[in-house]
């Protein structure tokens, strides 16, 4: 499965997502019997990193985020940025792609997972610092969309969690 056919927006995907795809390809090539008999078909979508950046700019928090990163007392800005991340607005084109994905999955449950370059890029592993959110994905398309959008925003907001910020600061990744 090609990433581009399952990517919402554009931009890089994180280390966990890339690693999962790489592992599947290695198994497919090196152990085809195991791959075909034991590995379930891959069925994920990826939200490109540019969606986060666009969301941050459109939601009016990019300047605040930059100010936080440059501040010595960066943790004091995190709660305000978290609120902005939870209450921002996605571009109409991204909303349409979210809707298409939800229509594709029907009412099957979805997990929104973080897979950022900062969180789990090569040499920067600190997996588990950002949230993963389970979406039951039940109800009308509008209800499912609202829950899914909230889940994505919650994962985005977890990027300014104090523990995540401290870990990133220790690695000079703010």
Segments predicted by a language model, with ranges:
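Nucleotide/phosphate-binding sheet-loop regions of phosphoryl- and nucleotidyl-transfer enzymes
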Residues: 1-174
């Amino acid at each position: 499965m090609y990433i581009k056919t399952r990517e919402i927006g554009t931009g890089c995907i994180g280390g966990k997502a890339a690693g999962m795809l790489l592992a599947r390809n290695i198994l497919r090539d090196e152990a085809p019997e195991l791959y075909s008999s034991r590995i379930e078909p891959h069925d994920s979508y990826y939200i490109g990193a540019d969606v986060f950046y666009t969301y941050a700019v459109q939601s009016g928090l990019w300047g605040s985020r930059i100010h936080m990163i440059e501040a010595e007392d960066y943790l004091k800005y995190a709660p305000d940025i978290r609120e902005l991340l939870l209450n921002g607005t996605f571009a109409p084109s991204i909303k349409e792609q979210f809707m298409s994905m939800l229509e594709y999955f029907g009412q099957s449950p979805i997990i929104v997972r973080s897979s950022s370059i900062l969180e789990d890029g090569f040499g920067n592993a600190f997996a588990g610092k950002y949230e993963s959110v389970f979406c039951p994905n039940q109800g009308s398309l509008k209800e499912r969309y609202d829950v899914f959008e909230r889940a994505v925003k919650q994962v985005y907001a977890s990027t300014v969690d104090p523990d995540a910020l401290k870990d990133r600061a220790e690695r000079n990744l703010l």
